[in-house]
Amino acid sequence: MDYQTDVTEDNVQIRGRARSVEGKKHNGSGLTGVKRHAVSETSQKSQQGTGNGTMTNIAEEQTITVTYNFNF
């Protein structure tokens, strides 16, 4: 949910045109960081034993990251 508030695609595109090289590097590192955090959170949840809940959460988080990849 926080990613939707932080996206502001219009501002990102305007700044991205002026700073295309820097913007791509920062966006790439940010997406990798999001994926790493998602994996760590799902691994901790899987240890708690809520198997079915973790699987649905993993699917939702992966779809969110994929949509942001297409937006960038």
Curated annotation (Swiss-Prot):
Protein name: Probable movement protein p8
Lineage summary: Viruses, Riboviria, Orthornavirae, Kitrinoviricota, Tolucaviricetes
Residue numbers spanned by region Disordered: 16-58
Superkingdom per UniProt: Viruses
Transmembrane segments: none
Annotated keywords: Transport, Viral movement protein
Composition bias type Polar residues, residue spans: 40-58
Keyword Phosphoprotein applies: no
Protein function: Cell-to-cell movement.
Family: Belongs to the carmovirus/necrovirus/panicovirus movement protein p8 family.
Cell wall biogenesis/degradation among keywords: no
